Amino acid sequence: MALSEAAVKVQAALLERGLETPMLPSVYSSEERKDKIEHHMKEILTLMSLDLSDDSLADTPRRIAKMYVDEIFSGLDYANFPKITVIDNKMGFDEMVRVQDISLTSTCEHHLVTIDGTATIAYLPRKKIIGLSKINRIVRFFAQRPQVQERLTQQVLVALQTLLETKDVAVKMDAVHYCVKSRGVMDSTSSTTTTALGGIFKSNPATRAEFLHQSK
């Protein structure tokens, strides 16, 4: 499947900046990946002494394979990059556009457990304006990968800068990491905040303060 122009531009921008998720070119189709994941997941679950003949577990390897390829790791395939609607800013709108409390669910690439939180994104329109729902979809696309929050924040920033043809973009993410909450230190109350600021959001203290203050 040919990639969209938007997907090609965003991927190239991330590669240029060293912000792309570490991944190899895929040599398998989606169905081939599911078959191979299912096979290896059967081995893993068997090694954990689970009885896959039980009707509750029999389909678990296939369910996991489908979930990985079609859902929680679907952002590894740029063929799934959202269809983007960007229009010329003919109205000359030049005030901050903000989308707040975007639901965010990702997966920690170190332990493959959940990252759960929200994102707030703002930009100052220059030449282009993007459909608001597309911002949510871009966040979701990059969240549907094994991730670290710092990279995810930067990836969303660069994607929007590329598509909007402006550096004036800001991204803030607040998330709970289940690799901290459900294992290891088992801290159930802490959360992690990351920001990525570009253009005027980085260079102008007043604009930066306005974004960060309203994002609390």
Curated annotation (Swiss-Prot):
Instruction: Note the superkingdom of the native organism.
Output: Bacteria
* Homology family: Belongs to the GTP cyclohydrolase I family.
Q: What does UniProt list as this organism's lineage? A: Bacteria, Pseudomonadati, Pseudomonadota, Gammaproteobacteria, Alteromonadales
Q: What is its EC number?
A: 3.5.4.16
List all disulphide bridges recorded for this chain: none
Provide the GO MF annotations for this entry: GTP binding; GTP cyclohydrolase I activity; zinc ion binding
Descriptive protein name: GTP cyclohydrolase 1
Q: Name one GO cellular component term.
A: cytoplasm
InterPro entries in alphabetical order? GTP-CH-I_C/QueF, GTP-CH-I_N, GTP_CycHdrlase_I, GTP_CycHdrlase_I_CS, GTP_CycHdrlase_I_dom
Residues annotated for Zn(2+) binding in this entry: C108, H111, C179
Q: Which PANTHER family does this one have?
A: GTP CYCLOHYDROLASE 1, GTP CYCLOHYDROLASE I
Query: Signal peptide: which range, if any?
Result: none
Q: Which GO terms describe its biological process?
A: one-carbon metabolic process; tetrahydrobiopterin biosynthetic process; tetrahydrofolate biosynthetic process
Q: In which pathway does it act?
A: Cofactor biosynthesis; 7,8-dihydroneopterin triphosphate biosynthesis; 7,8-dihydroneopterin triphosphate from GTP: step 1/1
Per UniProt, subunit arrangement is:
Toroid-shaped homodecamer, composed of two pentamers of five dimers.
Q: Which reaction does it catalyse?
A: GTP + H2O = 7,8-dihydroneopterin 3'-triphosphate + formate + H(+)
Which organism encodes this protein? Shewanella baltica (strain OS155 / ATCC BAA-1091)
Q: What class of enzyme is it?
A: hydrolase
Which keywords appear in this protein's UniProt record, sorted alphabetically? GTP-binding, Hydrolase, Metal-binding, Nucleotide-binding, One-carbon metabolism, Zinc
